[in-house]
Amino acid sequence: MRSTYLREYKLVVVGDGGVGKSALTIQLIQSHFVDEYDPTIEDSYRKKCEIDGEGALLDVLDTAGQEEYSAMREQYMRTGEGFLLVYNITSRSSFDEISTFYQQILRVKDKDTFPVVLVANKCDLEAERVVSRAEGEQLAKSMHCLYVETSAKLRLNVEEAFYSLVRTIRRYNKSEEKGFQNKQAVQTAQVPASTAKRASAVNNSKTEDEVSTKCCVIC
């Protein structure tokens, strides 16, 4: 039986201005392509779906890419559980900005890695491409993340990009939980050894005192 529980995932769409963040988000939520470019300050959308047999409620934050809104970035980076890092394959500058966004996420989260998916958008404009697929794949490899080429206009790999991020979050959380459990197990295993060491020290002290003074040791 499939689960009816809807686990909420806070997804944040990040990238330079004009790369198609809003178009991707609205295609996911409304199955509609927004042709005109209207710079976003911050919009939030929610979508119920099922991913690998598990219910999910996607809370998607579509963010501003313009430099004048950069002060807002750290605020949404603190709350995001996973990030779509989006660039436009016809814009070299949008590709170059990805590393800056990624490093800022790691700094805010104080982590060496974090759930992200690298999204190369506007792949329907192949004739105008200036960032090769190989370059995108290499960048994704350096960030230890999945690489997806999308077209908001053609609705190509839109769901795959968002759903892959949810899967990445799930794997990351399981890994973090396992690491925490292992740490707890190590700490628990160390307690008896530490206790035994203290007990041994007390017994040795007691023996020495009994021999020399015949006094009782209170500890």
Curated annotation (Swiss-Prot):
Alternates between an inactive form bound to GDP and an active form bound to GTP. Activated by a guanine nucleotide-exchange factor (GEF) and inactivated by a GTPase-activating protein (GAP). The lineage of its organism: Eukaryota, Fungi, Dikarya, Ascomycota, Taphrinomycotina. The keyword Lipoprotein applies. This is Ras-like protein 1. One of its GO terms (molecular function) is GTPase activity. The modification Cysteine methyl ester is found at residue 216. It holds the Pfam family Ras. GO terms for biological process: conjugation with cellular fusion; establishment of cell polarity; establishment or maintenance of cell polarity; positive regulation of conjugation with cellular fusion; positive regulation of mating projection assembly; positive regulation of pheromone response MAPK cascade; positive regulation of protein import into nucleus; protein localization to plasma membrane. Belongs to the small GTPase superfamily. Ras family. Scd1, scd2, cdc42, and ras1, in its GTP-bound state, act cooperatively to form a protein complex. It comes from Schizosaccharomyces pombe (strain 972 / ATCC 24843). Residues 217-219 form a propeptide. It is found in: Cell membrane. A lipid is attached at residue 216 (S-farnesyl cysteine).
